[in-house]
Every structure is written in C-alpha cells, then in structure tokens.
Amino acid sequence: MTSYSFTEKKRIRKDFGKQRSILEVPFLLAIQVDSYREFLQEDVEPNKRKDLGLHAALKSVFPISSYSGNAALEYVGYKLGQPVFDERECRQRGMSYGAPLRVTVRLVIYDRESSTKAIKYVKEQEVYLGEIPLMTGNGTFIVNGTERVIVSQLHRSPGVFFDHDRGKTHSSGKLLYSARIIPYRGSWLDFEFDPKDALFTRIDRRRKLPVSILLRALGYSNEEMLAEFFEINTFHINPDEGVQLELVPERLRGETLNFDLADGDKVIVEAGKRITARHVKQLEAAGVAALAVPDDYLVGRILSHDVVDGSTGELLANANDEINEDQLAAFRKAGVDAVGTLWVNDLDRGPYLSNTLRIDPTKTQLEALVEIYRMMRPGEPPTKEAAQNLFHNLFFTFERYDLSTVGRMKFNRRVGRKDVLGESVLYDKKYFAERNDEESKRLVAEHADTSDILEVIKVLTEIRNGRGVVDDIDHLGNRRVRSVGEMAENVFRVGLVRVERAVKERLSMAESEGLTPQELINAKPVAAAIKEFFGSSQLSQFMDQNNPLSEVTHKRRVFALGPGGLTRERAGFEVRDVHPTHYGRVCTIETPEGPNIGLINSLAVFARTNQYGFLETPYRKVLDGKVSDDVEYLSAIEENEYVIAQANALTDAKNMLTEQFVPCRFQGESLLKPPSEVHFMDVSPMQTVSVAAALVPFLEHDDANRALMGANMQRQAVPTLRSQKPLVGTGIERAVARDSGVTVNALRGGVIEQIDAARIVVKVNEAEIGGGTDAGVDIYNLIKYTRSNQNTCINQRPLVNVGDVIARGDVLADGPSTDIGELALGQNMLIAFMPWNGYNFEDSILLSERVVEEDRYTTIHIEELTCVARDTKLGPEEISADIPNVSEQALNRLDESGVVYIGAEVRAGDIMVGKVTPKGESQLTPEEKLLRAIFGEKASDVKDSSLRVPPGMDGTVIDVQVFTRDGIEKDKRARQIEENEIKRVKKDFDDQFRILEAAIYARLRSQIVGKVANGGANLKKGDTVTDAYLDGLKKSDWFQLRMKDEDAADAIERAQKQIQAHEKEFEARFADKRGKITQGDDLAPGVLKMVKVFLAVKRRIQPGDKMAGRHGNKGVVSNVVPVEDMPYMATGESVDIVLNPLGVPSRMNIGQILEVHLGWAAKGLGRKIQRMLEAQAAVSELRKFLNDIYNHDNAINAQRVDLSQFSDEELLNLGKNLIDGVPMATPVFDGASEAEIKRMLELADLPQSGQTQLYDGRTGEAFDRKTTVGYMHYLKLNHLVDDKMHARSTGPYSLVTQQPLGGKAQFGGQRFGEMEVWALEAYGAAYTLQEMLTVKSDDVQGRNQMYKNIVDGEHEMVAGMPESFNVLVKEIRSLAINMELEE
C-alpha cells in the first residue's frame, strides 16, 4: 500500500490501472536541466571537473602558442560569478539572466636563447570572458526579459554510414552503393560506385575523384592497394606449354571451364559444365593441390604485381594489367617462374578497385596530393608543402577534424571492431608511419596496423559484392539528440576559436611589450557568439507558456530541423514517418500537423539520453519467464538483440509469464514467443507516448489522427479563472503539474506559520534544519497576476492553512491550470450528444447561458503596452499630460506625469501615456526664436504621439512601470513607484527577519527553559530559567544570561551569532535591492524613458471561440442559448453543452463517449457523497461507501486505496473534496473496461446504458429517444474570436500601389479579389464594381474628394484613375515600351 502525502490525502483518484507501476514518472525536464548542469559544472571543484561543457571547450582551444613558439597561453580553470539581477528583475527590466564567466589563464614566456625551452617568466590572471546565460529552475533561459527554451535537436550521428541510391541515379535502375564518414566537425568523406562499377571518393561533396587517388595520397602503391582488396591466385608457368594453378577449390565455384577437371583418371567436372558447391566438396575431399590448366585460362586475368625480368631488370608487365598472349610468351622467355593474379568473378568478387586504377591519371603520391589540392582549391597554384598541409588538415589533425567519442564508437562498431574507443581523427597505418612528428609516432605506437579509410572501402565493396547490408538512416541508433549543454558548448568553442586567432597575433608582441593575459584576450567574440545563439538561433525558441502542459512539452521537444539538421523542403516521407525504434523513445502520436509533421517530435514519458546522446528507454528484465523489478535502459542499437514483451503481458502472483506464447517485439517486428525466450518487458503501457498524449484518457479507443489533435490541442488550452480537475484523467496529471514548476512545492517539511495571498511562511521541522545560520524558516513568495509569453495570466494561490503539517514536496500553492496540485486544463461540463436546430452543424458547439453566467470559461489575458520617449534630431520627446489639441476628458485618466492610473478602466483609443514629439517643419527666424524664448509658446511645435489603447481592446490597468535612463531626472510617477517598491521590499525583509528572529528565539527558549543559570538580569546564581521569566525579559537581554550548562550557554551564543548574521545579511540584501531600484535603467540607445502599462482583459466565452475535448473533438461555439431553452433531464437539470453525434463515428474517437459515461458516474458518486454529508451520516458509513468506490476490484494488480490511513477528520475532508465528483484515472492502454464503467454507473444509481430521457427546454416535450449524457473535460483554446475579428473604415495604405494594407496587425482591409470581381461582373453590378476598384481602393484623389463630399453632406462620387494603373504604366516603361494616355 502506498502512503499518502498531505496534498494527496485531500483528494484521491480512483485508479483503474491494472499494471503495477515499476517506475515513477521521471523528472520531466531532466533532458534540459541535466544537460545544462553538465555544461556549466558550477558546483564541481575545478580540479574534479569532467571533460564536458565549458571545461572541455576551454581545454580544446588552449594552450594557444605564438607562431614562433616563444610564448603560450595556458588554461588553468574557470569560475562563474553571481548574477547581477535575479530572474524576476531580469523579466521586469528586459535583461538577460546570466553570470559572468571568469577564466584563469597562465601566460608562459620561454627564453629564446635557451635550447631546451627554459621558462623565462609566468603570469597567471583571471580574465572575464563574457556573460554565460543561466538556466532557471524550470529549464528556461531569460533573454532580454523573455523566457526562451532551447529545444533539443535530433541530428545524424557522426560515424560511418552505408547507403544506396535506391536505383534512382542510373536509368537501368542499378543500385549504386555509397559510404559516408561524417565527423562531429570537419570535412565529410564520401565513397561511391558509378554505374560502371568504378569506385570514387568525394571530399565535402565536391567533384568526385577515383578512390585510388585518395589511397595513393595516403602512401599506397598499386601493388599494395591490390593486395589489400583482393585474394591472389598463383600460377606457375611451365617452360614450354601449360600453366600450373595452386588450387583453392572454393575459388572455382560458379566458373565454367573449357577443359575436363580431373583427379588422376577420375573426371570430377566435365568441360563446359558449371562448377557447383558439390564439385568443390569433391575436390576438397580428393585433396587436389595443383591443377594443370591451358595457357588461355591465364590470358585475360589481372596481374596482382609488377613482373620484372630477373636478369635484365626490365619491366615486363605492370600490376593490374590484363595478361595477353605476348606477355605470357615474354614471361616464358625471361624465365619467370610464377605470377599472381587477382581472384575476381562476376558473382561475389567484383574487380572494382582494379577498374578504378585504370581510370586513375596519377602515378605517384605527390601527383595524388596535387590532384586533391586542385579539387579542393581550384585555380590556386599547388606547391608540395601546400598540398601536403591541405591533405593533412582535412582528416588527420585534431584542430580541424573531430569524430567525437560517439562518432568513433559508431565507426568502430560499423566496421566490426571490438574496441569502441579510439582517436577522434581518421587513422591510417601507412600514412602515419611515413610521418615522423611526435604525434604520428604516438598514434603508430597505439594503433599499429589499423586503417580507417581502407576498412570503410572494404566494407563498401563487401556490400557491393552482396555480403552485408546498408544502414537505415531513420533508425534511432543512427540519429542522436543534441541538447542545450552540447549546443552551448559548440557555440562557445566557435567563439573561442575566433579569439584564438586574435590571441596568436598578439602573443608575438606579448614578450616585447610586457602584455598581461587580460590585454591579450578580447572577450567580445565569445560573448557575441553566445548571445547570438541564445537570442536568435533556430533552436532558441520563445517559450510556449499557454499552460503548464505546453511549457513541459516545449522543453521535451525534439527538433529534426535547425543548423546541422534537416530542412523542411528536403525532408522526405521516410524521415517523417514513425519508425519501429521510436517505440518508447519518441512519441508516436504527438507531432504538429502541416509542413513540420514528423520533423518535430516529443520525447516519450520514460525516455532519456545516454552518454552518447542516443535515446534509451527502460525495460524490466525477464529471466526464464520470470519478470523481475530490475529496470535496464536500452538504446535502439542494444535493443536490436533482444526479444521484448508488452507491458500488459499476463503474469501470475509470482510474476511468471503465464501465456504459452507471449506477444513480443524483435528487431522491429511483432511476433509470438514462448516465455523462456523473452529477455525484457515494457515498464509501463504509456511507455510509447509523450506527456501530452498520456493525458488523454481512453487513448486506446481513439483513432491516431484524432489522438494527435487531442494531444496538440491540450497545449492550447487557456487557463480559466477557476481551474477544475478533470473528473476522468489518466493519473499522470500530478506529475505534470509538479514538474512544470507552476505550483509551489515545499522544499522542506514543517508547519505553516503564516500565510497571505502573496506569501507562505513555513517553520521547518527540527530534523531538516541545516547547521550554521540556517534559522529553520522557509519563505515562499507567490507570483501574482503576471503576464505569460502568450499574454495569459499567471497567478498562484495558497492551498494550505496556518497550522497545517506539511512534508517535503507537498503542494503549497496552485498555479494557473492546476487544482490541488493536479493539471486542470479545462472544465467538467455536462454534455449531451444530440442535434439542436442546426446549431451544431459541422462540429459547432451549442452552449448554455449558465456557462457564461458562472464564468466557467472566463479567462484573464494580460496585455503589455509600451511607450518609449526617444531623443530625436529635433529634440527629446517628452512624456507629459500636456498634449496639444486633446480634450480634457481624454486626459482624465492620466496623472500629472502623463501616465495612466492603476485601476483605470480603459477602452480602444484611450490615451494611456501622454507623449509629445517635436516637429520641425518650419525654420524659425531669429526674431521668432526670441519671441518663443520669451513667451514660451510651445504648443505649436510639438505633435501628439501618445500611447493609445489599440483597436478592439479594453481592460483594466493593473500595473505601470516607468524606466528612466541613467542621469535623467525621474518624474513624480517614477519616484512614487520607486518609493512603493522600496517600501514593499523593506516590509518583506522586515517580515522575513521578524519571522526568522522569532523562530530563533523560540528554539532558544526550548533549549534554556528549565536549565540552571549562573546569573543574568534579575537572576541569582543557581536560579532556574522559566517561561514566565523569559516572557518578562527584553529579547536583547536574553543574551546576558549566563548558563551553568555548557550546551545551553552554546545555544545562547549560537542564537546571538545567528541573529547578528541574519541582520547583517538582510541589511546587505536590502541595500543591494534598494540600489537596484533607485539606479537608472539600462535602456536601448537613444531612449530616454520607457513606460510599460499592463492591461488585464477579461474574456468571457462567446460565439466564434474555439473549444475542444481531449480526443481531437474540436469545434467553434455557434450560439449561447438561455438556460430555459436547453434540453433538460427528468431531474430538471439542464445540460451545459450540446454536441453533434455525427462528429463521432466518422472520426473514430470513441474515447470521448467512454469519458462521458465515466464522467457521469464520477459526478453521480460525488452527489451521493454530498447527500451522505448533508444527512450527517456516520463516518463509518462514508468509509464503507468510499471503500466500495476505491477497492471494488479484486484482481491481482488492481490499484487499492488504504482508507485505514485516514483519521475520521481526514476522511470527512476527503469526502468534502469529492462532492464535486470522484476523480477517476484510466491510464493510457490500461484503462477502465466497459464492465468497470457500468459498475461505477450502477454505484452512482445511474442507468448503465449511460443514456437518459431529455426534454426540450422550449416546449417541454420529451425527445423521441434517449440521449447519451455525461461529463466531459472540455477546454477553451487560445483561438479567441476577439483576437481574430477585425474591421476597418480608414487606415494605412501601401506606399507603391496606394491600396489598403492587409491583415489585422496592419489595420488592413479585406481584399476584394479576382473571384469577387467576377461575381459582381456576373450580376452586372457595374457601379458597385467601379466603386470597389477606385474610391474604395487606390484612386487617391477620388477617395479624398469622397471624404470631403461626405463631410459636406453631398453623397456623390467621381471615380478617377487608380494608382495601380500608374504603377502598371511605369512597369511597362521600364521594359522600354512607352505608353501615354491621351485626353
């Protein structure tokens, strides 16, 4: 039995899950938080830091040596400072939340004269390397005041990949195989076959070269190449006639000989017959070692080596020549005893490299190097050194080429090596053996005779020969996840490399000019690279903050797009499709609809990344059919070897698999296996899906397409005024709310001491109090009415009362869309499935007026409006209430500084901040200037540029912030805001100090009461300290007490030290805060003052708003009907929402029907509990009823609730919280069965069919048949008609065409397009059409004249020349065709 926490005891979900949970839902933001923690390694001592993140980047670039080698800059360590502003201040001020990075570097100068590089002097110094953004506790970054998320990227893993072109390149449809070595950074190396079976290579996708050029550049000769790739047949040449072949029978298979193959007299294969495997076996049995063959058998074979005349040294034939009869004769003449030929055939030993050598124009290593140089740098004259350096820098230097540990691991596994470790550059035995620098010697010593490039070519030729298979690039073993930390490290390294170049230049001057490390290093490139990445990278995204779920999902996104990834246009169907390896790693359901489908994925609930960045998923071990609770994480590569059973495989009480054949997965296929052959078993049924999909109850009954929409639309739900937990959930709601960070969770257990709307104070348990100055008080400040990124309202409200005993992790306050610590995205509505007068045609939704009345779907949106006063060429703009040509009434909401009051209710067009801008159309004469100066007539030379409420918006001002540039005097409003803020901070600190002080005194009291004192105020030696005595003593005099007991004396001293320390700390913190509040603000260049006004807009639900359930059942509100007209039940209760039943069968999302049934039962049970409580039934009766609800199922794994843990008071409290409905959980793929739903309906005294008789609210008549009625959790989505409705009378025009702009943001018009013109033409409405095309659009004079006419009361129009016609004339003239209009 589980024990329940303080929060969980308030309301318990009835869980229908049959599978015992082996693993708790892991921390959902781990992928972000852990990755960045490893990048910073902030809490790790410098000497213990792992080779990761910042540390690795710094180590890889340093030491930097000067060109002469006389000076070097070495890296010692780094540390991060304290952030200047905390998270809240950064959001408010529009700053980035980060900490300064200080790197300790050592400048070493060597003595030039000394031969042994003696050190002349060393200087160590801390250098500032820019700000490093810090991650908030919730996995976000604050960049320029907005919260952003760096999403993870799924990219192709470094390593080597083999593929073919699927027969698309050549018209014959022949498969052309290719290999590609992809490093983490550096040049790509490709190998490919052409249709004629020659092998080519490309570097960085440039033009192709025969592969032998690359091998020759590595130092291989023709003979060595052939020896590496071919087995050799040896022929002994008889002096007069015939040839003896050294026989390897296997090599004859598939050949047809033109002579009898005999062993002595016994003919094994007749001439002209093909040699089969049976013949080969006979030859092996007979032990034939040599075979006499005629000369023509040797002619046409390919030589494996150069043939030289032993006596004269004359070259008779080259390696790779085809032997002809003349050469054979020459061999005989020169007395050549034996020649070697390549063993090739058409079956499985292709002569590919031999073919390639024939088209290779180069003969020496140098020629090959020059050829590569010409291909890489066309047009540059090659020199020997340049060619060698270029080639070496391509693949063999650590600076330019890095396979990375992942790449090396993948490479070695693919070419069949046992060892997964190795160098991060490509290694070749021949190439490095010929070089004689230290690095090459080390490599040769460690890796003797391996050759990366040769092995890749060997594997490729084997695949071409029909042995081996190509790779599947969509397999998750070939794609890895790059998370925040790794991307930040790469960007940081790029910045450092830029610095490195500059430092190298300066290092040569360091010695002569006595420069310090600080003067050598310029931090700007590093800071710029980091800023650019966090501010504008494709993977740094504006956080989706609609509701807690959208935050969590955004942080768990996996993007295939972005730098180094795919592009939308080039991504084909295969990349986007669901792959068998996605199982348990990437959600198979949640992905956006539209052009990004399949490219943006979500991590599965239990997925995590391993040290190489591959996604892995947990499985339970199975041994001999017994399922254990040991969990092992497997990546897609490892999983390939195992047979894995489903999570719902049947087991008995001893955890043995009971079925004769268990449904399993093996290598991406589904099959049945006996229990003894099963290796692993899924951990949980929801293993395959992401968090959003796991929140859809009865997901297993929904069609996948609709489930996708359901998962996606939950992220768009707007937090309502009062959250309501879903009656039918899946049991994962609590985990999502906990990890999203919107709730306030207790850091330590204790007792609630003080509470108000904005703050909770907890007195911590003795056991959890740390040493030192820890006074055992935790203070939680709640977030009140703050704007989210999506303009929804973030507000936290307390859940606890004074005196409540809480434990660590308990929920103290709810945030947006949470209800007692559970995710609550919408409202539970009473729903009927029936048509109603066409108002639910095409998925429309009919609402009851009661829904609007009770504010069930009322949401608060907070809009931020900004007014900026700049310094212009004509003088500064000014924020003031003195605005020309504006009525008094328009200014009555502004104070004397010209800023709107808090609490003012404003509508579209109202002035929020008065601002005037100097206008300088008239040049003043000196006389006028003098008069102006004397009389100060100012109104005429400024224009009104005030901040007004945008069209279509109204609301209440809830906050105003004024930012003033440093050095400019603050106005009255700014000073007032500043004073209020200082007062608030002071009160906050005073309260905190008072609470801490009280806690310290209370602890001290418990330690000294009843102890004997040696003296003190009004105390004699030997007196006992009592409570009454302490009550009468001034607090400060407590420290005068001298105790006999050592411990008590220590306690007094400790308490005094604690109070003094806290007092000092609070004073310092207050001074710091005060300084921050009073200092000027860091504004953009040219900005003098900035005013931000926050408007709270209340939006009720109305026709045109989009709503949805959790099963992809979306629709638009068509009408809001009075309560009395809605269909009602026999009890008189009318329904809230009427949905169209036709929306269900074709969409196949039956989950919504089951949810409605179970929701009705949940509500019915709640009503039954309410009746019990109202009748004041005995607690035992309530306990029995709750036991019936929670523990009715006697299956082995049924989830049970131990009600004996609850005291009577707790049970009554639980009962009260269940009045609104008993919440149920039906986990995905493991949900409630039909029988269980029926049982719940029966318990609630409701019809088991889930249907009831409804009556028409307007006539009172019963409908013809019974209707499905019940409760569904229904959401209001962030597609509100208020944001989309828009109308224009007059507004801005396009500069060139003079036509009205388009779109709501530009206050544009509606386009009267080509088809609409046809419609008017068809009706013959010529005058209407003329009006549309001229005065209502782009006839500039006509429209101005028309305005005048309307003002004058004359209703007539004269259509003139449309401006677009003039544009057309100008465009034709630009083609040198003159066109003129004649009167």
Curated annotation (Swiss-Prot):
It catalyses: RNA(n) + a ribonucleoside 5'-triphosphate = RNA(n+1) + diphosphate. PROSITE patterns: RNA_POL_BETA (PS01166). Its EC number is 2.7.7.6. Keywords: DNA-directed RNA polymerase, Nucleotidyltransferase, Transcription, Transferase. CDD domains: RNA_pol_B_RPB2. The keyword DNA-binding does not apply. GO terms for molecular function: DNA binding; DNA-directed RNA polymerase activity; ribonucleoside binding. This is DNA-directed RNA polymerase subunit beta. It comes from Xanthomonas euvesicatoria pv. vesicatoria (strain 85-10). The lineage of its organism: Bacteria, Pseudomonadati, Pseudomonadota, Gammaproteobacteria, Lysobacterales.
